[in-house]
From Swiss-Prot:
Coiled coil: none annotated. NCBIfam families: S16. One of its GO terms (biological process) is translation. This is Small ribosomal subunit protein bS16. The keyword Coiled coil does not apply. The gene is rpsP. GO terms for cellular component: cytoplasm; small ribosomal subunit.
Length: 82
């Protein structure tokens, strides 16, 4: 199973926020996921990023590939990924 760390869109029309989830790469954007590891709210000023550092590192260590956007969010949150 190819696993990705990606954003799942939530919220109302024109007022989105995103959950950072671990999901099978074949499932739809807002479909089934394995685990929720944080959230991102771009509407607040400044943007809110909350990630569970242990879960992020665990999933990356197990082979999950973060999307480009999630990579940037991980860097902004100050989580070191090795």
């Amino acid at each position: 199973m190819a696993v990705k760390i990606r954003l799942k869109r939530m919220g109302a029309k024109k007022a989105p926020f995103y959950r950072v989830v671990v999901a099978d790469s074949r499932s739809p954007r807002d479909g089934r996921f394995v685990e929720e590891i944080g959230y991102y709210n771009p509407i607040t000023e400044p943007s809110t990023i909350k990630l569970d550092e242990e879960k992020v590192q665990k999933w990356i260590k197990n082979g999950a590939q973060p999307t480009d956007t999630v990579k940037k969010l991980i860097e902004k949150a100050g989580i070191s990924v090795k």
